């Protein structure tokens, strides 16, 4: 009987330690893991600069979300953004200095594009799986992304 309780307790500990993570990605409590990164949606409405600053304060290496392929975008839509009401989030892609030098706030290479041409910051319209340039002073919900 004692052995059974010990094994059951051990399995419970393993289960609880893995809950909220994907395929062994170790993320902070309340964050979801995908492909060696952690993600968390925030309902607060902020302008782009405030949202980016907020993300950098949440976890070491955290920034507004960067998307590098359709699979990652689908993960964000299905697992993360489902908690948000309007389906429009800030993302880390920007050209705040108006130099036509687009880049992700986390320093990652711009290797996947899906946008219209307009302003200097980007929102992700999750219902359409589409990016749109918009004015950086508007307010939107956002997703933070951090290395696991």
From Swiss-Prot:
Signal sequence, start to end: 1-23
Keyword Aminoacyl-tRNA synthetase: no
Record-linked SUPFAM superfamilies: C-type lectin-like (SSF56436)
Domain (C-type lectin) ranges: 34-145
Location within or outside the cell: Secreted
Annotated disulfide bonds: 27-38, 55-144, 121-136
InterPro entries the UniProt entry points to: C-type_lectin-like (IPR001304), C-type_lectin-like/link_sf (IPR016186), C-type_lectin/snaclec_domain (IPR050111), C-type_lectin_CS (IPR018378), CTDL_fold (IPR016187)
Molecular function, one GO term: toxin activity
Gene Ontology CC terms, in alphabetical order: extracellular region
Keyword RNA-binding recorded: no
Tissues expressing this chain: Expressed by the venom gland.
Database matches in SMART domains: CLECT
Pfam families documented for this protein: Lectin_C (PF00059)
Keywords, sorted A to Z: Disulfide bond, Hemostasis impairing toxin, Secreted, Signal, Toxin
Primary residence: secreted
Family, as annotated: Belongs to the snaclec family.
PANTHER family tied to this protein: MANNOSE, PHOSPHOLIPASE, LECTIN RECEPTOR RELATED (PTHR22803)
Purpose of the protein: Interferes with one step of hemostasis (modulation of platelet aggregation, or coagulation cascade, for example).
Additional observations: Shows greater sequence similarity to the beta than alpha subunits compared to other heterodimer snaclecs.
Assembly and oligomerization: Heterodimer; disulfide-linked.
Name of the protein in question: Snaclec 8
Source organism of the structure: Bitis arietans
């Amino acid at each position: 009987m004692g052995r059974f309780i010990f094994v059951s307790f051990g399995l419970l500990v393993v289960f609880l330690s893995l809950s909220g993570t994907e395929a062994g990605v170790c993320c902070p409590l309340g964050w979801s893991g995908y492909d060696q990164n952690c993600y968390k949606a925030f309902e607060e409405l902020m302008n782009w600069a405030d949202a980016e600053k907020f993300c950098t304060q949440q976890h070491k290496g955290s920034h507004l979300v960067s998307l590098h392929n359709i699979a990652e975008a689908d993960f964000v839509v299905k697992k993360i953004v489902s908690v948000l009401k309007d389906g429009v989030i800030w993302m880390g892609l920007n050209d705040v200095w108006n130099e036509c030098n687009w880049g992700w706030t986390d320093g990652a290479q711009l290797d996947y594009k899906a946008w219209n041409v307009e302003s200097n910051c980007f929102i992700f319209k999750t219902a359409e799986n589409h990016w749109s340039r918009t004015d950086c002073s508007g307010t939107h919900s956002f997703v933070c992304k951090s290395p696991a």
